[in-house]
Amino acid sequence: MTALLQVKDLTKRFGGVTAVDRCSFTVEAGSITALIGPNGSGKTTVFNLVTGYLPADAGEVWFDGIEMRRPHPAKLYRKGLSRTFQQARVFGELSVLENLVVAAGHGWRDMFCARVSTGDRKRARELLSEFGLAQHADLPAAKLSYGQRKLLEFAAVMMSRPKLVLLDEPTAGVNPVLIETMEHHIRARHAAGTTFLIVEHDMALVMRLCSPVVVLDRGAPIMTGPPAEVQQDPLVLDAYLGA
């Protein structure tokens, strides 16, 4: 397999606290890779460093064979790297459909001046149908349930046909039925060619969905391997499972 994302010796300090400590791992193209670890282990900070929401103090991020020097979210988005957040981020005052149009790279002026292409509107409606949100297309996004906003955010990042999607706790705060729905959509997009890196606390979901699994502790990987091996690794049991 080919490395799509390479994180090399990534380091981030906040004052005297080292949140990410020479962190290195690889996400292979075509994989669903998990990044797990106890609370405070640095998972979301790694996501923020990789996607340009935080500057790194040291280290390198390589995406699709190119080093991302001073990565910026918009630049990475155009290159095919998208992400979601722990708390679903949508434009509550816009309609559900308009959220996807904006995600295609169109600003407010484009929408109001009818500059959005027919192709983008068609893709937006197709994604809303795929994610079970078509009946809410004209509803303000703020009216959706929290779980539906999670699905909307996921659909929005797919507008650009990304090569790699980083999902930050995609099932946090949603009901069991929606967890199954989210898993279905991850599998479907993966089957269509999208690579995923997922931070998730639902270990049952991680173990049946992801391989490999990267385990962080104190900002650094302590184990990378298939789910069955990770579950039995003494370092993981000590650091993550609290054994």
What kind of feature is each model-predicted range?
Residues 2-243:
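Glycine-rich phosphate-binding loops of nucleotide-dependent enzymes
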